[in-house]
Design a protein with these regions (language model features):
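Disordered, charged N-terminal biogenesis/targeting segments of membrane/secreted proteins
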Residues: 1-48
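Extended, compositionally biased low-complexity polar/Lys-Gly-rich tracts
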Residues: 9-16, 53-56, 299
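Alpha-helical structural elements
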Residues: 17, 49-52, 69, 282, ...
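Single-pass transmembrane signal-anchor helices and their membrane-water interface zones
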Residues: 21-33, 54-81
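Short hydrophobic short-linear motifs embedded
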Residues: 39-57, 64-65
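Short, positively charged
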Residues: 44-47, 66-71, 287-295
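Polar, acidic low-complexity tracts enriched in Ser/Thr/Gln/Glu with frequent Gly/Pro and Thr-Pro motifs
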Residues: 74-323
């Protein structure tokens, strides 16, 4: 077989084995154009993204909770004010920023006697005032006849807000105990001289300030005489001698029930002066001290003569007579 014949045979065999694609290609080219089928988009799950956002919210909430908790713990432990309650017992209360008692300290032996049976830590101001007033009443330091309490707050440690809250708490406690309330309340500025005097006299700085205000305005009442008196007697003396308190609020009035009635004392004074009620054209009375004892001093006039008669406020004995 010649080369030409061999090549022709090979071409024939290749054509026979190769599929005829031309007709199919031609048919596709001649057919109308079709829109490609839109591919279906499968959304990716958002679990990962949501899980990340949830974690961030949890973290933020935890930070907020810790901040609030930390602030709350700070407010419960850090002193927010120091106040003293005086009747004759003198009790110092340190309170936190939420108005709860952190500690109670006795400033004199009478106060220690009162505090021995009390647990005031973590109590509210109202509860502490209720318990202190009730204990003072039980122990005889407060009663319907001796009803005055002095509230003193150190300046810069609670100031007027604490003073007002504690004064209101004491007023409420006295009412609950069946007393007519009598509360003196003050904010005390830092005064080194006053603190030295208070320490030497064995009294609170608040009581020392009350004594100073009385002795400064009433010539015949000295600090040495006043220092041993309970708060109720100081309150009586201040009111009777028209003391104008500076920086001190007053609620109610001091009771004089522990002393003889006015009419009884007046009758003793009239008899000692040789007068009758009809003879008197002018009369006045004030409480004062003679030898450290409370007396009722009557100034009487019959139009011709003037008398000053001092009657012991407890025994009704005449202590002094001039005129």
């Amino acid at each position: 077989m010649t080369d030409k014949e061999l090549l022709e045979q090979l071409r024939t065999e290749v054509v026979a084995e190769t599929p005829d694609c031309w007709s199919a290609i031609l048919a596709r080219v001649q057919a109308p154009a079709q829109q490609p089928e839109e591919e279906k988009v499968v959304p990716m799950p958002e679990h990962g993204r949501r899980r990340g956002a949830w974690k961030r919210w949890v973290a933020a909430a935890a930070v907020f909770f810790l901040a609030v908790l930390g602030g709350g713990l700070y407010a419960t432990q850090v002193p927010g004010g120091v106040a003293t309650l005086d009747a004759n017992p003198s009790i110092e209360l340190t309170v936190n920023k939420l108005g709860r008692v952190l500690s109670a300290r006795a400033c004199n032996p009478d106060a220690q006697f009162v505090l021995d049976d009390l647990e005031l830590r973590n109590q509210s101001l109202q509860t502490a005032a209720d318990e202190i007033v009730a204990a003072m009443q039980t122990d005889g330091y407060l009663s319907a006849d001796t009803n005055s309490v002095l509230v003193t707050v150190e300046a810069g440690k609670g100031d007027a807000r604490l003073r007002d809250r504690l004064a209101a708490a004491v007023e409420s406690a006295q009412t609950d105990c069946g007393m007519d309330p009598a509360v003196l309340a003050q904010v005390l500025e830092v005064d080194p001289e006053l603190e030295v005097y208070a320490s030497a006299a064995g009294v609170s700085a608040g009581k020392a300030m009350l004594i100073r205000q009385i002795s400064d305005q009433v010539q015949d009442l000295s600090g040495e005489e006043l220092v041993s008196l309970p708060i109720n007697d100081l309150n009586i003396l201040a009111a009777s001698n028209d003391v104008a308190f500076s920086g001190m609020a007053s609620i109610g009035a001091a009771s004089t029930g522990a002393y003889i009635p006015y009419d009884e004392a007046l009758q003793v004074a009239l008899e000692r002066c040789g007068l009758t009620a009809d003879d008197v054209t002018q009369a006045s009375m004030r409480f004062t001290l003679i030898d450290g004892e409370m007396v009722m001093e009557f100034a009487l006039s019959d139009g011709e003569r003037n008398y000053v008669c001092s009657v012991d406020a407890e025994t009704a004995e005449v202590c002094r007579l001039t005129g």
